[in-house]
Amino acid sequence: MTLTHVNPSTMHQNPYFSQATLVDGGRLLFIGEQNGVDASGEIVPGGAGPQAAQAVEQLKAILADVGVDTSAVAKLTVYYSKDVTLDDVFGPAIERWGRQPTAITVLQVYALGREGAVVGIEAVVSLPPLGQPEEDHTLPSSVVGTAPPPQQPAPPLPK
């Protein structure tokens, strides 16, 4: 299985996402929208930040359950309601997600399907073929473009 983050040098570079992700071989896991709910199904208190953090933790638990980590995620889709801002969601989510620059779509929506939910995150994950171990997803920067090194401060969020 090969997962290649595609970031042409002629396009904006961001350490938190890739412009595209190419998946060769393997299997795909589609993770449905995860809201910020606890183990009993109740929405975590505190608003967008805690909900985003919990949604990421749930994604990571699913990834661990199938034997991979965030580096195997080919694409994320993040939904947040009109009642919160991207800043409310992004910081807490990135703290838990880390710098795994996958392809991402972020949508502000009127509302989510569950009352009280203000954040939802979905993922498409590249899994190794059955019976084969997970491979290293890192390819030379000459193949996929570059993103700023992790030690650089993150760029401001787009407005």
Briefly describe each language-model feature range.
Residues 1-57, 61-74, 80-159:
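N-terminal presequence-like segments and the immediate start of the first folded domain
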